[in-house]
Amino acid sequence: VSGSLGSSTRDHRVNIQLLGEEYLVERIGMDGDLDKMKETIARLDGKVDAIGLGGITALFPVGGKTYLLRSARPLLEITKQTPVVDGTGWKKVLERQVILDLDREGIVPVRGKKALLTVAFDRYSMAQAFAELGCDLRCGDLIFSFGFPCLLKGFPVFHRVARAWAPAVCLLPF
């Protein structure tokens, strides 16, 4: 089950079969209500195999170190039986690989192109992939997250800012 801070109008459930096993996959929107999300996670504990967090990222890997968003900690600590995860693992592996594969296969030639990530802090591995492909990378973290009129030019600049700011940013309220 994915508990999302997003709109409940997008709720959905589907039965799927993988490797001969039947699974129910469900998305439950909380309409921005963090308390409702906490209650839902507590109610589902022990009744589902896993709970995914939607609309909030708990963990931010930045250059070999992972930072925990303080506001997300309570969501991760509610359950006693059921694991609670966010999309960090998917982002760390899958998004980076997709960028590299799309370029390598010629589906979306990215190498050397201009790339803008509005919030690279939440897509660190994707930013790395663009840098590896020699893209003219711009990171809009300061503009889009904090309203500072400053575009971070290139992965090395973004990386230095992310490492310096991550401890403080993860203390800010969600």
Annotate each PLM feature.
Residues 39-44:
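Short amphipathic alpha-helices and their capping/turn segments at secondary-structure boundaries
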Residues 46-49:
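Short acidic/histidine-rich motifs immediately flanking catalytic phosphotransfer sites
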